[in-house]
Amino acid sequence: MNPALLHAVQSANGVDLERAEDAARELLLALGEDPDRDGLRETPGRIAKAYAELLSPEPFSPTTFPNDEGYDELVIARGIQFNSLCEHHLLPFGGVAHVGYLPGDRIIGLSKLGRVVDLFARRLQVQERLTSEIAAWIDEHLEPKGVGVVIEAEHLCMSLRGVQKPGTLTATSALRGLVRDDPRTRQEFLALAARQT
């Protein structure tokens, strides 16, 4: 099992709020703003606390259970909403993750799939790595016959700045095991992930 993945679950993110607040104040000054004026006086502290919250995943215990029923079809949690921060611009991106697996000997509580998404989303990220990390975590902890993750997200670094194309969605996928290698299972997963409710 990958020690880095276990570490991510078991350790809390250490944030120096005082230092972050000082840095936010310096940023405001560098942008030509007066951090001592009425509207900005509390802003550096708010920025520090907001980023600390956005970048601190909730630790959880990855409880798994024996697959006593021998369930051998896909398990998919669709439309898991998430928000993250682009590591290039520190601007938010968010959307939905569709996470599925083909059980082997172990299964996991459905709520844990949402927690896994948050575990990796609540850090500085790029969407491609986020997608792969979620798939790797499920593969490591469950040892399923296959894993599929599809993420669709809007990036504010693309909507608010640069090309300024609001509403543009980026889709990424990470497929492993039979979800990648078996054409029928792959097609079923992708169809279920794309299905509109």
Q: Locations of the language-model features?
A:
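A domain-level signal for the structural core that forms small-molecule/cofactor-binding pockets
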Residues: 1-197
